[in-house]
């Protein structure tokens, strides 16, 4: 009994090498397209570090133009409150446990802006779990 390979059972080396080349090209090009297609907020969320390294000691609530609450998660173990001030272009990190900041958040919860309410609710929920 002899074992002979049929010609149809063999894989030509030319198609195998082109298949390997195609697989490597796809492997290296897919992550680049995925990173370019992701929105900016998704890329920020994938950074595994805290945004707020230092906290502002005090701030006038009338100077706050926008308030963003980032709940605790895999990127940072603590809740972060970031305020955009009316007279500055930089963001300021605030202490989420400060009584004044809690009052500002409660005032925002009473407002009509749904997105702002959602951010403030995330802060209240995460603060109650800590």
UniProtKB/Swiss-Prot annotation:
InterPro entries: Chemokine_b/g/d (IPR039809), Chemokine_CXC (IPR001089), Chemokine_CXC_CS (IPR018048), Chemokine_IL8-like_dom (IPR001811), CXC_Chemokine_domain (IPR033899), Interleukin_8-like_sf (IPR036048). SUPFAM superfamilies: Interleukin 8-like chemokines. GO terms for molecular function: chemokine activity; CXCR chemokine receptor binding. Pfam families: IL8. It is found in: Secreted. One of its GO terms (biological process) is regulation of neutrophil mediated killing of gram-negative bacterium. It comes from the Eukaryota. Disulfide bonds join 50-76, 52-93. Residues 1-37 form the signal peptide. Keywords: Cytokine, Disulfide bond, Secreted, Signal. The keyword Signal applies. The keyword Nucleotide-binding does not apply. PROSITE patterns: SMALL_CYTOKINES_CXC (PS00471). Coiled coil: none annotated. GO terms for cellular component: extracellular space. Monomer. Homodimer. May participate in the recruitment of inflammatory cells by injured or infected tissue. Belongs to the intercrine alpha (chemokine CxC) family. This is C-X-C motif chemokine 5. It comes from Rattus norvegicus.
């Amino acid at each position: 009994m002899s074992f002979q390979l049929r010609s149809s059972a063999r894989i030509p080396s030319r198609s195998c090498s082109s298949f390997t080349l195609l697989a490597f090209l796809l492997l290296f090009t897919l992550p680049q397209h995925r990173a370019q297609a992701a929105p900016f907020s998704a890329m920020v969320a994938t950074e595994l570090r805290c945004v707020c390294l230092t906290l502002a000691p005090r701030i006038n609530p009338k100077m706050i133009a926008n308030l963003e609450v980032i709940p605790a998660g895999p990127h940072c173990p603590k809740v972060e409150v970031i305020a955009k001030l009316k007279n500055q272009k930089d963001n300021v990190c605030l202490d989420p446990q400060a009584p004044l900041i809690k009052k500002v958040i409660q005032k925002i919860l009473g407002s009509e802006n749904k997105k702002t309410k959602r951010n403030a609710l995330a802060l209240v929920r995460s603060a109650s779990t800590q």
